Amino acid sequence: METWQELKVTVKREGEELVSNLLIELGAQGVAIEDSLDYVGNVDRFGEIFPEVEQQEEIVVTAYYPDTVDVTVVEADLQARLAELTDFMDLGELKIGTTALAEEDWADNWKKYYEPARITHDLTIVPSWTDYEATAGEKIIKLDPGMAFGTGTHPTTKMSLFALEQVLRGGETVLDVGTGSGVLSIASSLLGAKEIFAYDLDDVAVRVAQENIELNPGMENIHVAAGDLLKGVEIEADVIVANILADILIHLIDDAYRLVKDEGYLIMSGIIKDKWDMVRESAESAGFFLETHMIQGEWNACVFKKTKDISGVIGG
């Protein structure tokens, strides 16, 4: 019987996407995330009661490798790559461990982490293998979280989805920068956007986004391509959304201002609290006005508007 290997990495929460992507690049056949924030809180806005779970600063990223892969080499390579990034991001005290699994354990083990999750008033994310019957008005996003880039339940993604629900009214052109799983593009389509153009520098992300989009019917209005932020893009948009690290966000703000239409919006997420002032100042220097600021735990997200009428914006 073929066996699989489980490699667990304990890392600070802000390192989730970075570590997940590195593990996939190093040959992982799937990743799963254990995060106490997914369960913390007594009652959410939909009246769902969550169990009492102590909130932790760290999460566990679990990657799965076939027994043909030498995970000691993977571990060494991962350690070396992460060591190069310690000045860029505080990943905490990294802990890495491995376990052997039988084939039948691998087939179902990682799926136990994922259940349908109501994210906003309208949007529910459902694992691709789950039969789920939507209620009236509920919009379903099918994702395959085994492909990488998480499940769409990370705080930065949740706030991005709330922001899209806030600004989209139907008929808009949306640019999704750093699309990852494609979840924000799929949500934009479900919320009525006319055309969505999704970009990612990572070829794996481009493939994963396309595969997730194909899990959802009626997504022909989403166009996925490789791209470095908004460089070379000449498409005017009503909404630009980017859920990526703050140090990268500041490099797309000028292009975003160039491309977003008057009265259009720039949504940014993935901003740890220590970087919020930097991002806000960069956006305001470019000419944007802050309309909405959201905080969940240590994460910030925001909606900026390109407008001459500042009566409805923060500080206007």
Curated annotation (Swiss-Prot):
Keyword Cytoplasm annotated: yes
Domain of life, per lineage: Bacteria
SUPFAM superfamilies linked to this entry: S-adenosyl-L-methionine-dependent methyltransferases
Subcellular location(s) per record: Cytoplasm
Reactions accelerated catalytically: L-lysyl-[protein] + 3 S-adenosyl-L-methionine = N(6),N(6),N(6)-trimethyl-L-lysyl-[protein] + 3 S-adenosyl-L-homocysteine + 3 H(+)
GO cellular component, one term: cytoplasm
Binding-site positions, S-adenosyl-L-methionine: T157, G178, D200, N243
EC nos: 2.1.1.-
One example GO MF annotation: protein-lysine N-methyltransferase activity
Pfam families in the record: PrmA (PF06325)
Main location: cytoplasm
Family matches, as CDD domains: AdoMet_MTases
InterPro entries membership: Ribosomal_L11_MeTrfase_PrmA (IPR050078), Ribosomal_PrmA_MeTrfase (IPR004498), SAM-dependent_MTases_sf (IPR029063)
Keywords: Cytoplasm, Methyltransferase, S-adenosyl-L-methionine, Transferase
Biological process (GO), any one: methylation
Enzyme class, first EC level, given as a word: transferase
Keyword Protein biosynthesis included in the entry's annotation: no
Function according to Swiss-Prot or TrEMBL: Methylates ribosomal protein L11.
HAMAP family membership: Methyltr_PrmA (MF_00735)
NCBIfam families referenced in this protein's UniProt entry, alphabetically: prmA (TIGR00406)
Family: Belongs to the methyltransferase superfamily. PrmA family.
Name of the protein this chain belongs to: Ribosomal protein L11 methyltransferase
Species lineage: Bacteria, Bacillati, Bacillota, Bacilli, Lactobacillales
Gene that encodes it: prmA
